[in-house]
Design a protein with these regions (language model features):
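ER/secretory pathway lumenal C-terminal domains and tails of membrane proteins involved
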Residues: 20-186, 206-403
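Short periplasmic/luminal acceptor-recognition loop of GT-C membrane glycosyltransferases, typified by
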Residues: 189-201, 278-285
Length: 403
């Protein structure tokens, strides 16, 4: 009995130590957690800060943990200046004024009274103070923020190249992004929801100097005057002026979908460039669904119908590099998007199996079936609670294409 009690106490102590161990706080798109985890991490990093108030890495993680906890629990409330995140900013201002970590953090959250931070002035300061050992995620963040507020700045390319060299995005995301980029027509416009999707493509352009003819446009950036001004200049078209208030009065809560759609259509018509979208665009905007066609991993705008299946099949056969998806030793990394990326391939490409068969190309049909089957296999093994149900659904989806 005594031995059992000792063993249990040892186990409890070990678990307690692990629970209190400070861990790097990553973006939730890479690795998300429950609010309780962020609260515990905030306590752990607060201890590190107390031990060494000049430790910028500790402050960085304390801020991120606190910010995510507030974000996921409604901690900002009606007045974000009274939140715990705001308190961390104030303490950093007192302890580490004009520091890299303070300016980096203000890029993610700033007091409503801080007009300089709201303008983005802190982004330039963070870049000026950027340490050589800055983590890849933070370099990528600064690259995206600078791209948004000052897209013609030479440091945009330098930062994206630096983030690429440090390999923040997993290789499979980079390959997925490269496949999409290579399939676009010359001089194309590519719209996607936010910089988390577009950053890998921008890295490929800047670091590898590939497909720099393509103009990548995060939809959220359409609301930023400096980005729009630079974009219209690049496309050699007149700037567009829209009254946001009119959209709010007319469309209510969905005003932004119509506002963004009108900007997108203006850019398409005035630039006369081939235009593509990420596959989630239809749920994010008020674009005409009948004018958007699937070409494999991307959607294309076309005012007239055309044989988009031929283009999609060409992309699978000649453009996309998909063999890595079938490698037996390919396993999921820690990123939250791993499973989603596999399922994107299955959902978007499965119907092409039957198209290849009907065209008499049995080799490509079997090749695509083999690749997508591996995607399903990985996805199912990641979710044991739903294994049989999910496996049956996706296996039937793929097998149905062979009939």
């Amino acid at each position: 009995m005594r031995k059992t009690i000792v063993m249990m106490l040892t186990l409890v102590c070990n678990l307690t130590v692990r629970a209190q161990q400070a861990e790097t706080i990553e973006s939730f798109i890479a690795n998300s957690h429950e609010p309780e985890w962020y609260a515990a991490q905030a306590e752990a990093w607060q201890k590190r800060v107390n031990e060494n108030p000049q430790d910028q890495w500790a402050w960085r993680n304390l801020f991120r943990a606190t910010c995510y906890h507030d974000q996921f629990t409604g901690g900002w409330g009606e007045n974000q200046d009274e939140s715990r995140t705001a308190d961390i900013i104030r303490k950093m201002e007192a302890t580490l004024p004009n520091s890299y970590v303070l300016n980096l953090s203000k890029g993610r959250f700033c007091l409503t009274t801080d007009s300089a931070a709201r303008r983005g002035d802190n982004i330039y300061k963070a870049i000026e103070y950027l340490p050589e050992d800055a983590c890849a995620e933070d370099i990528n963040y600064l690259a995206c923020r600078l791209w948004c507020i000052d897209p013609d700045n030479k440091d945009v390319g330098n930062l994206f190249s630096g983030a690429y060299k440090k390999r923040w995005f997993p290789a499979r995301i980079m390959q997925f992004s490269r496949n999409m980029l290579l399939s676009l027509q010359s001089g194309a416009l590519y719209f996607a929801n936010g910089d988390a999707v577009t950053a890998p493509m921008k890295m490929i352009q800047e670091a590898l100097k590939e497909r720099q003819d393509v103009t990548i446009i995060p939809i959220s950036y359409l609301h930023v005057e400096s980005f729009m001004k630079a974009l219209c200049k690049r496309l050699n078209i007149d700037p567009l002026s829209l009254n946001v208030q009119n959209y709010g009065d007319k469309y209510g809560e969905d005003w932004y979908k119509h506002y963004e759609s009108d900007i997108i259509m203006y850019l398409i018509k005035e630039s006369k460039r081939p235009t593509y979208f990420s596959t989630d665009i239809l749920s994010l905007t008020a674009l005409d669904k009948d004018s958007i066609y699937n070409e494999g991993l991307v959607l294309k705008y076309s005012p007239k119908p055309y044989n988009n299946f031929d283009v999609a099949m060409h992309n699978v056969k000649e453009v996309y590099s998909l063999e890595y998806l079938a490698e037996p030793d390919l396993v999921y990394d820690s990123w939250e998007t791993s499973e989603m990326l596999d399922m994107n391939h299955v959902t978007l490409l499965a119907n092409l199996i039957s198209k290849f068969r009907k065209n008499g190309d049995a080799f490509q049909a079997e090749r695509l079936y083999r690749i997508l089957s591996k995607c399903v296999e990985r996805c199912v093994s990641k979710n044991p609670k739903e294994t049989e149900k999910r496996k049956a659904y996706y296996e039937n989806l793929l097998k149905g294409q062979l009939q």
